[in-house]
Amino acid sequence: ARFDENEYILLLTLKAGEYTGSRVSDVDLFRIRNAMPHLAETLKKSLRPGDAVAQFSDSQYVILLSACTYEGGMLVANRIISKFYQDNKIYRNLKIKINIEKVKTTENILSKYTG
């Protein structure tokens, strides 16, 4: 990462619009699972070559944003969400939750691998 920029982990979670914390219905799970490949396609189109993405669960993608600020990471997340809804109007009833955290490293972790 550049001197004034860091790496951020971005977690995007698809949720059914009616989701209130109780058990998710089979219909909602079906909609979420069908939407995930479309979100993956949006991610491919939206991320830089140095960014890494992986499916984290049936309803989540985790993205490592390199050389980024918090504000830049939020811009990326909102751009992805806007593009997803623009290209996939059928899934507008699904919500996408954003979680973003700065990647933290400590001397102990680094020293373990550097001798």
Protein language model regions, located:
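Conserved catalytic/dimerization core of cyclic nucleotide/dinucleotide signaling enzymes
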Residues: 21-36, 53, 72
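Residue-level signal for beta-strand positions within conserved beta-sheet cores that form or flank
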Residues: 5, 49, 92-96
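Active-site-proximal structural segments of metal-dependent nucleotidyl cyclase/transferase enzymes
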Residues: 1-24
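Conserved helix-loop-beta segment at the catalytic/binding core of cyclic-nucleotide signaling proteins
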Residues: 11, 36-70, 89-91
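Short amphipathic alpha-helices in soluble, non-transmembrane regions
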Residues: 39, 76-83
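Catalytic strand-loop-helix junctions within cyclic-nucleotide turnover domains
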Residues: 25, 64-73, 88-115
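Short, internal active-site loops enriched in acidic
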Residues: 14-20, 59-60, 102-106
